[in-house]
Curated annotation (Swiss-Prot):
Keywords: Cell wall biogenesis/degradation, Cytoplasm, Disulfide bond, Fruit ripening, Glycoprotein, Glycosidase, Glycosyltransferase, Hydrolase, Transferase. This is Xyloglucan endotransglucosylase protein 7. The gene is XTH7. It is found in: Cytoplasm. Contains at least one intrachain disulfide bond essential for its enzymatic activity.
Amino acid sequence: MNAEGGNLHREFEITWGDGRARIHNNGGLLTLSLDRASGSGFRSKNEYLFGRIEIQIKLVAGNSAGTVATYYLSSEGPTHDEIDFEFLGNSSGEPYTLHTNVFSQGKGNREQQFFLWFDPTMDFHTYTILWNPQRIIFYVDETPIREFKNLERHGIPFPRSQAMRVYSSMWNADDWATRGGLVKTDWTKAPFTASYRSYKADACVWSGEASSCGSQDSNPSDKWWMTEELNATRMKRLRWVQKKYMVYNYCVDKMRFPEGLAPECNIS
């Protein structure tokens, strides 16, 4: 299934916000707003089981401290799977923090955080989740920033059996989002608005019991995302981002995990 630059009316449904989420330009643009009373959100009409899903986002300019804009994949229930992009706002002139996480069978605690090498409030930038049976890759403008591999052979759960929808939201998290909750939301600057456009899903659509990628006689080249991996050039780029822009990595936080780091942290 390919939703190329998709009409956002067709691809998404607004799920909450009482008018604070709006679709404009005949389905070409979607905005989410937050004020003191409420945030807002939307989700995809389709569920997916593997794919390469991207959207362009322009984040809140100026003083966005305390606010969080999200874009993520998630299934439902207490043992849900989830793949997260969260954008943690900051005071004027300070950088956004891009927060990533992977949940499998209801367990997360796999946070990696990054600063960006550009101002994400000045223009739209493309944020992509690649999810196939072998790996999850987070991309920013086609630059890979994180890879989470399938290490089930080592007993580490991997999201590969639960279909997920795309979700996005704009909400207040000033109890933790900015400097651990020290900087609160300045409601005199409300409403805070993030903009979304150019959604694209090259993905296997899940409909109840079957996947659109399931037929044995279909051409596997049509589902190129199922085997996508990082070549040497992109691996070099990934290492560059992680060396220069990563600001938190759960795999080195022994204070937080005194009983031992997650097992995947010790597997190269």
